[in-house]
Structure formats: structure tokens, C-alpha cells
Amino acid sequence: MIIPAIDLIDGQVVRLYQGDYDKQTTFDLSPLAQLQSYQAQGAKLLHIVDLTGAKDPNKRQTKLIAELAAGLDVDIQVGGGIRSEDQVAELLAIGVKRVVIGSLAVKEPELVKSWFVKYGSDAICLALDVNINDNGDKIVAVSGWQSGGGKSLESLVAEFETVGLKHALVTDISRDGTLTGANTELYTELAATYPNILWQASGGIATLDNVAAVRDSKASGIIIGKALLINQFTVEEAIQCWPNA
């Protein structure tokens, strides 16, 4: 499945290079018009990251996200700075299909597990930003990559499998925003090891060949942000390469 994505800072569509707020590119685009274009080209799920909220949870762009949800017919998943159950409930109430939880799953797993129990495993996607070291260990980073987490991907997945983890978005940090291609070996391994989890691949997608490689890795979906914004290819072309299941 093709999952077009936009990142938002102060209401503007942006891209960061490897998660660095000092390496920001701003695009002169309307967020809603951009997402409606992706929807019109056949996307069935859209991914929105509130980078302002990720940096400062008090400045979450909830009003904008409500406007986006209202202006779209397809499902949206939203992440960025979600720290409390009130915020989860609010996003679900304004029409968000799935809430993306990152750092908090590492820092406060019991809290996040309680949300799986309350809202169901379809309502939450874990976002695991992974640093892979020279030994091949997959270490999950926290807080928008500004600090290391120290927990292995495998231990975190094992913990959340107990509450029915179904959706997980995995980014190899070294690839994000680089357009160097996805880490397909990682997704092949994850899909084989955890066949009951729908893995969303993210980071580094530059070409339709990259899209095909992720499709063949047996990931369930691929998040594409920068490549679409800079017109490397269109959503329509990506869906032709990997039809929505």
C-alpha cells in the first residue's frame, strides 16, 4: 500500500533531513490541497506528522489536523508529540483513523499499552525510529531522534505484542530524507519474523524501483514524503507499481 505523507510545521508543508529541525525545507503548498491531490490519485491512507507538536506538545496543530480530516474522505494517521490519552482521544474524535505513537512507547510502555486495550490495536500505530549499529542491533531512538533510546526493536515489539500490536511504522534513521533507497533487508526480516504485524516502511524512497523493492520485501505499506513533494514520481505511478490491497 502506498501511504503519501506530509510533515507540518506552523501550518506549512516541510521536510527535515534526518529529523534535524535545522535542516528544514519548506514547500509553498496548501496542506489540504496537497493531500486532496494524493487522495484523487488513489491513495487510501495518508500520513501526517505534526512536527511543531513533536517539538513542543503545547503547540500541537490540532485545529489544522481537524480541518484536514474534515476535507478528506480517506483514512488519515497522525503522529507528532502525542503524550497523553486526552490527545489520543481528541485526535480520534476529530476523524483521525489511527494515532501514531513514537517516543512514548519507549519511555512509558505501560501507559501506551493501556491505550491499545482501551481503543483497540487498529487505532494505534507504533512509530519505531531505528538506529542500526555495526553489530546489526536495531536500537529504537526517542524524542524526534534528538536522543538515543537504548531499547532494542525486538524487545519493544515483544512487549506490545501482548496487547495485540498490529500496525508499526519503522524508519531506518540513516535513510530518512536522503533519497538513497529504503533498507529493504530490514523490512524483509521484520515481515518474516512478525507476520501478524502490518509493517509500514519509511525513509529514503526516491524512485519507483525503491517502491518495488519495498513491495517485494513484504512490508504492508510504504510511507512516501519527500519524493512526491519534489516530483520524483506521482502517487498514481507509485500505486501502479504497488496496487492498494
Curated annotation (Swiss-Prot):
InterPro entries, A to Z: Aldolase_TIM, His_biosynth, HisA_bact_arch, Isoase_HisA-like, Isoase_HisA-like_bact, RibuloseP-bd_barrel
Keyword Cytoplasm part of the UniProt annotation: yes
Keyword list, A-Z: Amino-acid biosynthesis, Cytoplasm, Histidine biosynthesis, Isomerase
GO biological process: L-histidine biosynthetic process; L-tryptophan biosynthetic process
Top-level taxon in the UniProt lineage: Bacteria
Localization (cell): Cytoplasm
Active-site positions on this chain: D7 (proton acceptor), D129 (proton donor)
Keyword check for Aminoacyl-tRNA synthetase: no
Cellular-component GO terms for this entry: cytoplasm
GO molecular function, one term: 1-(5-phosphoribosyl)-5-[(5-phosphoribosylamino)methylideneamino]imidazole-4-carboxamide isomerase activity
Pathway: Amino-acid biosynthesis; L-histidine biosynthesis; L-histidine from 5-phospho-alpha-D-ribose 1-diphosphate: step 4/9
Assigned EC number: 5.3.1.16
Substrates-to-products reaction catalysed: 1-(5-phospho-beta-D-ribosyl)-5-[(5-phospho-beta-D-ribosylamino)methylideneamino]imidazole-4-carboxamide = 5-[(5-phospho-1-deoxy-D-ribulos-1-ylimino)methylamino]-1-(5-phospho-beta-D-ribosyl)imidazole-4-carboxamide
NCBIfam families linked to this entry: 1-(5-phosphoribosyl)-5-[(5-phosphoribosylamino)methylideneamino]imidazole-4-carboxamide isomerase (TIGR00007)
Protein family per UniProt: Belongs to the HisA/HisF family.
Entry protein name: 1-(5-phosphoribosyl)-5-[(5-phosphoribosylamino)methylideneamino] imidazole-4-carboxamide isomerase
Gene expressing this chain: hisA
